[in-house]
């Protein structure tokens, strides 16, 4: 383990004095979601996910999004997953919802999301990340790394296999704990983050999936 990764490990041990969070706790991480805000911002004429009209769920958990991400075969499936992922990522804050809904106005967004889902399940995380950056073949205008890494994570984490790294979410809170700038991450930075997370997992909670590390980095928020 290099010195910078060891510094991050020390931060996590301070933030979690009782030990690393359990994988079940991570999967149970949930947020209330602002259905009415999403209804107002969903593009007219676009396929409308049933969740917008359902009154059943008042919160969305990681587990819920992972389950929906297991099978995405059509553009409609991709839009349903995007809504669930973005609802989990924004909660009830109107400004955050407005930002997350903006990419849906882009032409061909559903087709690109479907392609990105497939890429996340078959390619190395950093390669998929590079394709979703500005200038990449899977670039969606107004969809930045803090959100498209959520897409890569939910699409590809459970599809990880031996020899291929598992994708993780990288946002400002995670970056702050890493001691990084809170924006402008390159594909090589994302690859470095994935490698650091694996090293941190091996040193701190070797039996856990690496999203336990991402959750801990997010929760610590630079502490």
Question: Residues of each region from the PLM?
Answer:
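C-terminal accessory module of base-excision DNA glycosylases/AP lyases that mediates lesion recognition
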Residues: 1-44, 146-149, 156-223
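Structure-specific DNA junction-binding interface
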Residues: 1-98
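Short acidic alpha-helix initiation/capping motifs at coil-to-helix transition points
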Residues: 56-62, 126-130, 192
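Helix-hairpin-helix/helix-loop-helix acidic hairpins
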Residues: 73-80, 84-141
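Short, solvent-exposed loop/turn segments at secondary-structure junctions
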Residues: 90-92, 154, 218
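Amphipathic alpha-helical packing elements
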Residues: 137-152
